């Protein structure tokens, strides 16, 4: 993501931003000579041009790649719920000695399906039933395994949450940097040249603006991937309860 975003910034964003700023400087110079008022429109290139915004976009695409891989993995596990992994005829009573035979198709699954939550939960349930012949123990082992998987999936989102926190923080760093630069150029504003001060204030507000917009998008995607993971765990538990 770093190479792609940096290439776009070097080849597209910053050259266009410099062209827009040069046009603005010429318009202001013409305004001072003629005394006419010139309206300067806000440009997206100028809003995006600084290094703070570039860092935010790099983090955004990085975290989106992480969530994309997680969404793909969860989707594969949800698709597995539509298959009949344990074939038990309706009305048939399953005996403890049948558990080993029923678990063989689960052990024959290819990777990575064999490591998915549903096959692991079914294997654990059948193994527990084969050793204890207790339905209560079967329900307990499925529930414990699903709870452990939910905790693991939640902990794996810690990097996503950290990046979601870091993006607006980078925006605020840009704000502090821009305001500090503006204060350093305050003597020029006193002399009548406010262009340096306004440019620095633009850096300050643009960085926060872009960072907050990106943060809103990332928070929404994080919420969606969390819902997908919770749904997968709950449907796996329901699948085991219904089919066993």
Language-model features and meaning:
Residues 2-19, 69-70, 170-190:
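Juxtamembrane "helix exit" motif at the C-terminal ends of alpha-helical transmembrane segments
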Residues 6-146:
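Large intracellular
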Residues 15, 67-78, 182-185, 216, ...:
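Membrane-spanning helices that line or support transport/gating and their immediate boundary helices
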Residues 28-36, 180-195:
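Peri-membrane helix termini and adjoining interfacial loops of integral membrane proteins
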Residues 39-41, 45, 133-167, 191-199, ...:
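Membrane-interface, cytosolic juxtamembrane amphipathic helix immediately N-terminal to a transmembrane helix
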Residues 49-59, 161-167, 202:
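Alpha-helical transmembrane segments of integral membrane proteins
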Residues 159-183, 205-221:
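Bilayer-spanning, highly hydrophobic alpha-helical transmembrane segments
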Residues 192-244:
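Channel- or pocket-lining gating/hinge segments that regulate access to a cavity or pore
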């Amino acid at each position: 993501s770093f190479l792609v975003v940096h290439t776009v910034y070097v080849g597209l964003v910053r050259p266009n931003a410099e062209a827009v700023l040069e046009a603005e400087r010429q318009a202001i110079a013409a305004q001072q000579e003629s005394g006419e008022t010139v309206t300067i429109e806000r440009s997206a290139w100028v809003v995006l041009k600084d290094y703070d915004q570039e860092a935010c976009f790099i983090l955004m695409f990085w975290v989106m790649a992480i969530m994309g891989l997680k969404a793909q993995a969860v989707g594969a596990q949800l698709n597995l719920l539509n298959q009949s992994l344990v074939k038990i005829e309706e009305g048939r009573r399953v005996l403890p000695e049948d558990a080993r035979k029923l678990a063989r198709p689960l052990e024959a699954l290819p990777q990575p399906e064999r490591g998915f939550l549903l096959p692991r939960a079914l294997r654990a349930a059948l193994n527990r039933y084969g050793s204890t012949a207790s339905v209560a123990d079967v329900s307990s082992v499925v529930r414990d395994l699903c709870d452990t998987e939910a905790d693991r999936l939640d902990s794996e989102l810690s990097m996503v949450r950290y990046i979601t926190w870091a993006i607006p923080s980078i925006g605020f760093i840009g704000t502090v940097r821009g305001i500090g630069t503006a204060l350093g150029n305050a003597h020029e504003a006193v002399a009548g040249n406010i262009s340096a001060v306004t440019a620095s204030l633009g850096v300050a507000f643009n960085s926060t603006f872009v960072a907050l917009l990106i943060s809103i998008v990332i928070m929404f995607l994080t919420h969606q991937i969390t819902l997908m993971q919770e749904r997968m765990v709950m449907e796996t538990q329901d699948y085991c309860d219904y089919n066993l």
